[in-house]
Each structure stands twice: as structure tokens, then as C-alpha cells.
């Protein structure tokens, strides 16, 4: 497993395994931290995947405390720990990313299915480079970003898109609102290029895009969210705020977002209608 997965996935998986072992012993995360001489929050942060567990001795002490004696069981955890310490793909970008985004990006790389709803801007994996540039440039002053930070942000976004065309890439299903696509980012020329990029990507076998028309009387979530599903790990949900990315893994939370997504997907015109909707929208907006 460790050889096929990214370090973020392995870190989160290791945390999940350690949490389950701790819960079987009836101990709290704080109690284990204090007993083993860790900082008060260390165990809970390791279990959530927020931080790695770089010291082999720390993992061995946890395994001993949780009565993990079988050599094979110990090797599974040791393998996860070793793999989780390899270089993070987005480590060099960490200083320009909002809080929580490095964890999300690391997990996105290993997702087998991605479902996203975006009511404000085009979902990052679908963005044309000119659209991404215009969006980031428009926020440059407000967010106090340097030109270098903008360029690096664009590079991240374009690198993420490459997974869509890689062998074994994820299944991607995106729901956008017409209002998102009517909101001009950059210029009409940028928007036309973005429309064409959505059409191009939606022609891929693993990508579906739906658009909720403005005049369709149906439910719309007020905030964006993305559901990531994995092979060998429970799904997670991500949502953005101004300065941070928040993630949920509780089954009831994930279920709630799944119901929202499924309801909107059922109501919106099917993916086959997306090229026509974009063509009609372009004609209405710019009379072409």
C-alpha cells in the first residue's frame, strides 16, 4: 500500500489506525499524550492526519501501549509511518496555501472519486489557465499576494488538472451554477476560453459536469463543497472559507453533503446538455 499511495493519504490512514487502536483500549487521546510525555494535543493531531509521526520510537511506544504485539500488524503500521514521511508534493507551496489546503491537496491526489459543487467560481480542476490567472490577479491586492505567489498558485492549479488525463485518474463529477458562469472573471475572452475548457474536459470518460440554470426552481447549497472518496479510506468533505479550508470525515457529515449533491445532480440538466448550455450562454451574454 505504502508504495502506491501519497504521503498525505498514508499519514491519514496511519492516524485512523492509531485512533481505532486507542479506542479499543478505552483511553482518551489526552491521557495517552500525558502518559507517554507528548504534548497534550499530539495524539489527537496525529490521529486526524494534521501532523506526521516522524519518530519511529514514538510509534513503537504507541504500539506497545495499545498492545499491538503481532509482528505483521506492527509492520503494517511501520510501513504506513515510513511512507507518510516521504516528500509531500505541495510542500514547497505550503507558505502560499490557506490553512488546511495542503492536507486537502495531498488527499485529492489519491482520491478515486471527486464530487464538487461550486456556486461562486469554476471548480479548480476545471479551470482554464487564463481564468485561474484572472481570478488570482483580481484578488492579489486584497489577499496581499506577491506576483510570485500568484504564479505559484496558478502552477498548483494546472498541476492538479493533470490527474484528470492520467491512466487511473479519478472519476470527477462537478455541479456549477449558471450564475457562476455568468460572472465575468477577467474578460469575455477569458470566459469563452473557460467555457471551451469545460467542454473539453467534460468529453473525457471520467469527467461529468452539470450546470444548474438560473431559472430552475430547485435546491442550491449556499456554500461550495467537495467530497473525496478513496480506496481503503473513509470519504472526506472539504469546504472553503476566506482564510481556511475545513474538512469533515464524520459519517453523518459526509452523508449530509452527499444528499445535497445527489439532490442537485438529480434536478440539474444531465451532463450531455452541458456543451449546449454553455453555447447558449455565450450567445446570450455576448451575442455571438
Where are these regions (language model features)?
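Interdomain hinge/linker segments and adjacent boundary elements that couple functional modules
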Residues: 2-6, 10-16, 20, 30-34, ...
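Short helix-to-coil "ATP-lid" hinge immediately C-terminal to the conserved N-box Asn in the Bergerat
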Residues: 23
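Short alpha-helical DNA-recognition segment
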Residues: 26-45
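Short Asp/Glu-rich motifs
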Residues: 41, 82, 221
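Short acidic (Asp/Glu) and glycine-rich catalytic loops that position anionic groups and cofactors
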Residues: 42, 56-60, 235-240
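Short, conserved catalytic or interaction motifs in soluble domains
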Residues: 48
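C-terminal regulatory/effector modules of DNA-binding transcriptional regulators
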Residues: 168, 175, 185-288
Amino acid at each position: 500500500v505504502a508504495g502506491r499511495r501519497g504521503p498525505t493519504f498514508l499519514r491519514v490512514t496511519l492516524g485512523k489506525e492509531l485512533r481505532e487502536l486507542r479506542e479499543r483500549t478505552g483511553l482518551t487521546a489526552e491521557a495517552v499524550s500525558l502518559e507517554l510525555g507528548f504534548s497534550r494535543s499530539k495524539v489527537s493531531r496525529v490521529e486526524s492526519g494534521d501532523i506526521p509521526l516522524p519518530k519511529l520510537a514514538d510509534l513503537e511506544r504507541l504500539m506497545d501501549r495499545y498492545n499491538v504485539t503481532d509482528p505483521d500488524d506492527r509492520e503494517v503500521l511501520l510501513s504506513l509511518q515510513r511512507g507518510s514521511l516521504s516528500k509531500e508534493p505541495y510542500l514547497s507551496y505550503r507558505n502560499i496555501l490557506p490553512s488546511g489546503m495542503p492536507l486537502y491537496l495531498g488527499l485529492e491526489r489519491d482520491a478515486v472519486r471527486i464530487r464538487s459543487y461550486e456556486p461562486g467560481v469554476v471548480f479548480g480542476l476545471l479551470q482554464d489557465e487564463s481564468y485561474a490567472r484572472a481570478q488570482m490577479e483580481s484578488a492579489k491586492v486584497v489577499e496581499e499576494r506577491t506576483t510570485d505567489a500568484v504564479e505559484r498558485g496558478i502552477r498548483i492549479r494546472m498541476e492538479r488538472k493533470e490527474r484528470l488525463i492520467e491512466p487511473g485518474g479519478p472519476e470527477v463529477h462537478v455541479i456549477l451554477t449558471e450564475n457562476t458562469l455568468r460572472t465575468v472573471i477577467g474578460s469575455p475572452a477569458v470566459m469563452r476560453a473557460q467555457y471551451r475548457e469545460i467542454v473539453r474536459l467534460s468529453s473525457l470518460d471520467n469527467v461529468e459536469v452539470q450546470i444548474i440554470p438560473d431559472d430552475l426552481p430547485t435546491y442550491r447549497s449556499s456554500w461550495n463543497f467537495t467530497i473525496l472518496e478513496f480506496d481503503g479510506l473513509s470519504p472526506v468533505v472539504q469546504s472553503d472559507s476566506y482564510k481556511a479550508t475545513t474538512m469533515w470525515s464524520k459519517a453523518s457529515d459526509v452523508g449530509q453533503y452527499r444528499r445535497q449533491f445527489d439532490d442537485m445532480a438529480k434536478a440539474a440538466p444531465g451532463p450531455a446538455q452541458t456543451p449546449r448550455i454553455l453555447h447558449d450562454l455565450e450567445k446570450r451574454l455576448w451575442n455571438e
